[in-house]
Amino acid sequence: MIHEITPEILSLDKSVYDEFDILTFDDCLYTQYLNHKHFAKFNKKMIFFLSTNIICPENINQSEQIIYCGNAHKKAFNGNFENYMKLSQIQELSKFYEIGGHGHNHILFKNSVYSFDKIKEDTDIMVSKFKEYNLDLNSFCFPYNQDNTFYKIYVKKLNLQIFGDERIPIESYIKNTKSYKPELKYC
């Protein structure tokens, strides 16, 4: 699982990537778009997980800043989407890679007071947005990599391949660097 694209991640040896069958990118951060060709050279299936309500408007200038995903979320939840991909970029990537679902609003449903109806509503909006955006939806990753029994039940009914906290953060291969943040797995 990859969030931020740091120089340390870009300099990891090919042998690290050989350990993965699939490379997954959470949140559709703009830096992931800028560097997708770097990861394509490892010849792995790649899935970019999209929260359909966190997309940069086409008329906004994007930031190439490497930003912790939690901080990017805070900015997005306050209306600033400059650290995320635009729909046109997501659609471009969909020609070569899979775009998976990551919820509509990127809500943390684990251990929450949210009802099954709220989970269903958020997921149904995500599904309808994928159709509206002409994107195939075959995979799903829980926001913050945290599942919830109701969430799992509903997503399974949609026949989506489910990804969660079983994924290994690529950052775990660079623990001794200043960019390592163990909390990244929760973005």
Annotated model-derived regions:
Residues 2-4, 20, 40-147:
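Metal-dependent polysaccharide deacetylase catalytic core of the NodB/CE4 family, i.e.
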Residues 31, 36-43:
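Aromatic-lined substrate-binding rim segments of carbohydrate-active enzymes
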Residues 1-24, 29-30, 34, 116-139, ...:
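C-terminal active-site subregion of NodB/CE4 polysaccharide deacetylases
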